[in-house]
């Protein structure tokens, strides 16, 4: 086996590193997952709630295998991967574009693309199966010493079909890893009731999913971060806190054990641990969150115009049915942008591109954001995701609808889905010959 042969533990062990990152080890073989250990993500929108333990970072470096669930930066963070070397083995789902795989090969030649249903052997009594989910995400089923661990990370289970599909793959589940708070920022500052509703709905759905999957132990994770900039900090006002989350889930599922782990904590996969110490540490961290100062370069109109023109050209080039969609959606393919740092207003559509505008009627579709956020929206492959998830913007309902329509091309193209005749035909055939999968080809 390539990689570090001398790892720190022989008996089965779980070390919680931070957010969605943990290290599983067994018989001197270790598997790390989704390392985000420092820095801001989603165009400088989120930061970690708690500091990563330095010893955990050292253990990450020594991991034999590192699995990434998907390409979002709180799971696959290029700037954090500098801690790894050619001695590490990387694991990722099989994809068409191979973006992640090609990036990882610059660090190590030991990159394994895991196809659906293939069980990858990590070591003795230690395997991982990667299950793609919807368009971009994936979950993992880990077998370790006759225990089954299901890591759902960000997979948003929406219906019974998906639950049944997953349960058929896993069989009885010993340990379930799940996200527990909202990870989206499309809510204006004065819409606190909306955010409260999100939080309640997340807990109710999570509880329902737990009842169906019926694991012995649940570890809520992948939500230990916060909205950290001045233009999205208000988004923290209704997020689910770990102590209240476990309190609610425990009442709804009294026969299931719920475990809270703090960065650096270790667990032998069997022992009963008290959550009190971890709760106290997280509550102290919640109290300390604050806006992180960040110098952001302003982008002048000429550069924004060039970025918008390139965005239009790329959209039309990659989607040969663009003009068909544009004909039927002209009124939704336009939006006004209020640039908060430049104190200027602009109008955008696919015909004129970006042009200077006067005052904006509140009944028109609008979105307020910084010039840098707008530039990132036009230029980044997942600029739309970064904006919607990061929450560094506000808009009216019409504006949000326009954002969804205008940038759906970009978002889907990043997932290798294109609006062209081949795609329409493929989707038509899929409806005729229904497949029983929970993911789209990627």
Regions found by a protein language model. Give the residues of each.
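Conserved beta-strand hairpin/beta-sheet module of binuclear metal-dependent hydrolase folds
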Residues: 10-56, 137-153
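Pre-active-site segment of Zn-dependent metallo-hydrolases
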Residues: 29-71, 78-83, 157-171
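Active-site neighborhood of phospho(di)ester-bond hydrolases with catalytic His/Asp-centered motifs
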Residues: 32-34, 63-76, 91-94, 150-155, ...
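Active-site environment of divalent metal-dependent phosphoester hydrolases
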Residues: 39-40, 71-76, 98-100, 118-121, ...
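Mobile, glycine- and charge-enriched loop segments
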Residues: 136-138, 143-200, 285-311
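Cap/insert and terminal regions of metallo-dependent hydrolase folds
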Residues: 160-252
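Feature captures hydrophobic
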Residues: 267-442
